[in-house]
Regions:
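Metal- or metallocofactor-binding catalytic centers and their adjacent structured scaffolds
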Residues: 39-120
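Structured beta-strand/loop patches that form or line metal/cofactor-binding pockets in enzymes
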Residues: 1-53
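Glycine-rich, flexible loop/turn motifs
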Residues: 13, 17, 76, 120-124
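Catalytic pocket of metal/acid-base enzymes, prominently hydrolases
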Residues: 116-130
């Protein structure tokens, strides 16, 4: 199966909660995340979600498409560690919240693992030893 990365797609999701959850320093009225899909030349699509806040979702999306995607398009999707190293510089920008780069990198990493598990027809939890 050809795991050459041909496209990266993201979708920002915001879902209201039925009730408000409160902690000592916060309240949650909704859940937010970014869904990432990686498409391959062989037709497989990996999918994962990461993040859980409104703040920064647009910037995370931008980091994925403007900083990470151009570097990994055309690469072998099974080379997960190598692609993580390629994506990692997105975490180095000291002028922005480092967490945003970490979530963007995690989004790609999780999606690559899902893609790899699908290529082996193995559930991801089994691939990881569960």
């Amino acid at each position: 199966m050809d795991l050459t990365i041909t496209a990266i797609e993201t979708e920002q999701i915001r879902v209201p909660l039925v009730r408000t959850y409160r902690g000592s320093h916060y309240k949650m009225t909704h859940r937010s995340t970014i869904i990432t899909r990686i498409h391959t030349a062989g037709g497989l699509v990996g999918e994962a979600y990461a993040g859980d806040e409104d703040a920064g979702l647009a910037e995370i999306d931008s980091i994925i498409h403007e900083e990470i995607a151009p570097k990994i398009l055309g690469e072998d999707g099974s080379a997960i560690e190598r692609l993580w190293e390629i994506a990692r510089p997105a975490t180095w920008d000291i002028l922005r919240d480092r967490r945003l780069g970490l979530v963007a990198t995690a989004s790609i990493d999780l999606t690559l693992w899902d893609l790899y598990a699908r290529s082996l027809s193995t559930p991801l939890h089994k691939l990881w030893g569960g």
